[in-house]
From Swiss-Prot:
It is a multi-pass membrane protein. Residues 10-248 form the ABC transporter domain. The lineage of its organism: Bacteria, Pseudomonadati, Pseudomonadota, Alphaproteobacteria, Hyphomicrobiales. It comes from Bartonella henselae (strain ATCC 49882 / DSM 28221 / CCUG 30454 / Houston 1) (Rochalimaea henselae). InterPro entries: AAA+_ATPase, ABC3_permease_C, ABC_transporter-like_ATP-bd, ABC_transporter-like_CS, MacB-like_ATP-bd, MacB_PCD, Macrolide_Exporter_MacB, P-loop_NTPase. Belongs to the ABC transporter superfamily. Macrolide exporter (TC 3.A.1.122) family. The keyword Amino-acid biosynthesis does not apply. GO terms for biological process: response to antibiotic. Non-canonical ABC transporter that contains transmembrane domains (TMD), which form a pore in the inner membrane, and an ATP-binding domain (NBD), which is responsible for energy generation. Confers resistance against macrolides. Homodimer. The keyword Transport applies. This is Macrolide export ATP-binding/permease protein MacB.
Amino acid sequence: MKAKQADAVLVLENIVRKFPAGETFVTVLKDINLTIKRGEMVAIVGASGSGKSTLMNILGCLDRPTFGRYWISGKETASLSADELSALRRNHFGFIFQRYHLLNELTALGNVEIPAVYAGYAPEVRRKRAEDLLTRLGMRDRIHHRPNQLSGGQQQRVSIARALMNNAEVILADEPTGALDKKSGQEVLRILDELHQEGRTIIMVTHDMQVAERADRIIEISDGEIIADNVSKVAKTKTDSQALYGKQVLKDQKTLGFFRSFAERFREAFVMALLAMNAHRMRTFLTMLGVIIGIGAIIAMVALGNGTREKILENFKSLGSNTLTILPGKSLSDPQAEKITSLVEADAEALSKLPYVSGVTPQMSASSTIRFGSVEADVVIAGVGEQYFQTQGLNAVQGRLFDQKSVHDRAIDLVIEKEALAVLFPHSHESPLGKVVHVGNVPVRIVGVIDPQHNGGTSSTLQVYLPYTTVQTRFLGTTQVRAITVKIADTVDSNLAETMVRRFLIMRHGEEDFFIRNSQLFRDRIMESTHILTLLVSSIAAISLIVGGIGVMNIMLVTVSERINEIGVRMAVGARQSDILQQFLIEAILVCVIGGGLGILFGMSIGGLFLLFKAPIHLIYTIDSIILSLTFSTLIGVCFGFSPARQASRLDPVVALSRD
């Protein structure tokens, strides 16, 4: 470093800055050598396009030189990372812009606090500091006003307070009076003079010589070169007797620890995300809509799958869950099945003694008619044992079911389904119990009524139940059994039980002249089909959610483009790349999480419609599906919000500040 002065705060050596212009480069700064001492008030003067603003950007670490070396308080900046440069801007520099660059969503107080948020000061410390600065700048009654409620002079004073927030050693003022009337401009210059009197280093960029003459030193730049560097003949007295703007205030204040500092920056990003969403409510809602529909559809489809599964299980209870049905032959289509007579009542008695069997009932059937008075209808007679109703999960809604004595005595006890009441007794509201009806030519007495069995068929023929012994003797004239239903104990696996029953009957018959239908296998196949269908429909819903995520990415890219100036301001006052990334990522996640919450409500409202219209299937919601949906919507926000947020964080501060 050429400059050996102990009081040198900024030193530039052979600085060159080039910008690409098509296939060539334009040189804006040419071999700049400059030393600025601590406590100087320097004015950089030049015409528009002379390179003075580019020089200020390099001085303030908003831009990097193409060639050359730059020291700040003895530290060379060439090898510093983006976050290290942001730390320099945060701790050493305060920027006063011609266009103020205040954030419209924040109050004057909020704008002034921003640098201290990124510096990690506690909320109460930075709030008091901001209030003190605004009060000393004559803004006490405007603390809670937003920028659009302030005049140009007032906005510039807020900008000055923001520049002083972190006790900046160097104040960089770019055309500080350029957008102000004469009175406001003089007030700003007076404040800069006071800051200079406190011992701060003031660097003003201006094209107005009257403004420049207030400085100790005037540097003229033309066509990217310093053509004059004159020291003012009028010496100014510096004093530290009155620290009007609290130069020492933050020296005794400790910054927050890493985690608390991160939490404060997260809170700031969260609040800004809410403010940004509120500023564009309709656009935010339309962006959420894709997420709402996608999450709602997934929630509803999963709930529908759960409801369908429960309905199937309920229907299986009426068909008999965990049961084995033993039939003669090799299969239902075996033409020799009718000739096989080896399946007998003794098999049922033997099976009932097995330890893993909780119930056994022989079965047979016959077709006939049922008649009461002048009413006659076709029926299927089911001859069953007393345990049949238990194995099928059927209970009497009126009267009783026949018992072992009824089976043993070949009783003429008849159990009918509830649907048969309207057919046999269309004009009577009396109890059917005890009434005698004719099944075929056999008079039988109604002893009980059950709910109809859901067998999945579409036949309209009524079904009635008699003891199988009665059917054998009164209707079929044979002791042959056409089927045996075995109820397996709930603690036993039905597939294992099926294997054991098969071996047991082969030992009894000497051959496998029967086949077994396992209700569990049938149930599993239907459940698998239901699961596949639910997965298919949920996949379609997930695609709509992904489309919604693409919409979030699109809007976030638009948001970054619209708020590029805000990004530049935040970087200028010390925001790290991670702070910018966090802010826009939180906004994307927030859009998706709120959309996910609304989507869950939407999905639940679909279940309400099912109840309202008395659909046969009810939607069953689970906490797992709700948590999964919220997690999925959060991941959508992270995945589709990361790219725009990363793009925002990688912006060059000087490029961002130059965009409106």
